[in-house]
Amino acid sequence: MGIRAIVVDTAGTTTDLNFIQDVLFPYSVKALPDFLEQNQHNVLVENCICDTRDIALEPDADLARVTEILQQWVSEDRKATPLKTLQGLIWKQGYGHGEFKGHIFPDFIEAVKRFSAQNLRIYSFSSGSVDAQKLLFSHSDGGDLTEMFNGHFDTRTGNKLDKQAYCNILNTISLSPKQVLFVSDVIEELKAAEAAGMMTCQMVRDSTQRTGEFRKISSFDELLIE
């Protein structure tokens, strides 16, 4: 049957976690107050504000309080969909203004080209919004990589630690579990993907927690698909 698709985690796998934590997150925290003030009547932003109130159980929270909640969620690395949507919108401005480029490990840049040439389908699965993923790969320091991807998945697909999220991905891409390889640095994500029947591989970069349970690679150069 063989592998026909590869699903990759982003932070810690295709992208340096430090870029997320030291560049993107602080940028969104700093930009949130002005962004919400200026865009609060935009339908998408307005929906995110309402969803934030609902999740926080603070239906009467004013804009300043909503901003505080969102900034607190950033510090907690909360995987809340309204936060991730707003971060994607804010980062779009930053990328567009040339304030930063998306960091992609060089070995993945070469690998995604190789996988594409092999007619393998390539997907990303991140707690960051689909829009944020597209921005990362389109404004990367390796150029625009988006045309090599077949799709992207985010929290709307499910929690990355839950088996059901990976079942949902399989249903969406219409492949059997053994035809799909999931690559991540996070053990709990690999366990969830394995529970859904997917093939798995742990990316072990410098700061990655190691385990004997999964096949390991330290670079996409080592991931050869026949």
From Swiss-Prot:
Its cofactor is Mg(2+). Keywords: Amino-acid biosynthesis, Hydrolase, Magnesium, Metal-binding, Methionine biosynthesis. The keyword Transcription regulation does not apply. It is an enzyme of class 3 (hydrolase). Pathway: Amino-acid biosynthesis; L-methionine biosynthesis via salvage pathway; L-methionine from S-methyl-5-thio-alpha-D-ribose 1-phosphate: step 3/6; Amino-acid biosynthesis; L-methionine biosynthesis via salvage pathway; L-methionine from S-methyl-5-thio-alpha-D-ribose 1-phosphate: step 4/6. It catalyses: 5-methylsulfanyl-2,3-dioxopentyl phosphate + H2O = 1,2-dihydroxy-5-(methylsulfanyl)pent-1-en-3-one + phosphate. Binds 1 Mg(2+) ion per subunit. NCBIfam families: enolase-ppase, HAD-SF-IA-v1. Bifunctional enzyme that catalyzes the enolization of 2,3-diketo-5-methylthiopentyl-1-phosphate (DK-MTP-1-P) into the intermediate 2-hydroxy-3-keto-5-methylthiopentenyl-1-phosphate (HK-MTPenyl-1-P), which is then dephosphorylated to form the acireductone 1,2-dihydroxy-3-keto-5-methylthiopentene (DHK-MTPene). Belongs to the HAD-like hydrolase superfamily. MasA/MtnC family. This is Enolase-phosphatase E1. The lineage of its organism: Bacteria, Pseudomonadati, Pseudomonadota, Gammaproteobacteria, Alteromonadales.
